[in-house]
Amino acid sequence: MCGSDATNKKKSSFDLALKGAAAFALVGVFAAPALAQMEGVLEEIIVTAQKREEALQDVPISVATTSGENLHAMFSGADDILALSGRVPGLYAESSNGRSAPRFYMRGLGNIDFDLAACQPVSLIMDEVVMENVVLKIFPLFDLHNIEVIRGPQGTLFGRNTTAGIVKVNTNRPADETSGYIRASYGTYGTTNIDGAVGGGLIDNTLSARVSALSRSRDNWITNGHTGEKSLGRYRDNAVRFQLLWTPTDRITALLLQQNRSLDGTSSIFRANVFDTGSADLNQNYQRDLVYYDGGDINPQEYQSSGTTLNLTFDFDSTSLSSITSFQSADGSSRGDI
């Protein structure tokens, strides 16, 4: 009997350990509230969901956030911002324009119109600048401080087109301490992802700078049945960001940011007759790496975008005044054989 009781206790302990591990795994990289445990102490999570730095526990808004290595792991496979879909409860993102023009849905609310001029109820804010046009919303994510997904109407603080919520992206800013990194990864279909950054002080406690760069690429991996050649699926995506932070006094901060992006590749691949009537299952007409396109242009996509932002902050002890001036532009084209 004693041996049986000991065995049962061991099995119970093992079962509890497995259940505990499974429950922890389900939390995912995004958490709300997120609790980071270091040496037995819970690290405080700071967010800017109300346009000021606050502890996540003190913000009366539904916010999911993540930072650091979680973000690196999320985008190390050369994924774009659509990678957030499925990782954040209540958020879905998709695009019918390849690596451009994403559409966001928060708690089921969104706009399915694929017109590039259509407004959306989910806004993307990058470094305090509203990326209103869908072409601007796909700027590559790299050298990130954190991402905050704010659910629910946010018009009071962030203005129009925030009926469903906000995706708020904050990149790493310049600092006096010299720091930097470089990361690289390689995957199937010749997929490569290389990004890095370096920054530090130029004038002690007065002027600092940071330069970040990214290069992503993939080879053609989809065969066009009409030609027998692998001529679809490729992309070359490069981006660079330069920041200059000037703090002439303890009360004045000026941040100048310039970023550019160049994309060349294949747009979305559309397929026909891959479902049977009355069924949601893919039929034998669907082959992941084979399509039949007889057009002259093979779904080309090319975009160039750039943006300049000046962020001025004046501190008045109990309050602060901010001025954000930004000019964003994008030019390009995308074609798809439907």
Protein language model regions, located:
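N-terminal Sec signal peptide and the immediately downstream disordered periplasmic leader
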Residues: 1-78, 82-88, 250, 308
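Non-catalytic regulatory/gating segments with a bias toward low-complexity or hydrophobic composition
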Residues: 63, 71, 84-85, 147-152, ...
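N-terminal periplasmic accessory domains that precede
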Residues: 82, 103-105, 125, 149, ...
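Short acidic/polar hinge/loop motifs at secondary-structure boundaries
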Residues: 81, 114-115, 121-122, 127-153
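Residue-level signature of outer-membrane beta-barrel architecture
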Residues: 126-128, 171, 200-202, 244-247, ...
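Outer-membrane beta-barrel domain signature, strongest for Gram-negative TonB-dependent receptors
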Residues: 229, 235-338
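Transmembrane beta-barrel wall of Gram-negative outer-membrane proteins
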Residues: 179-181, 186-268, 306
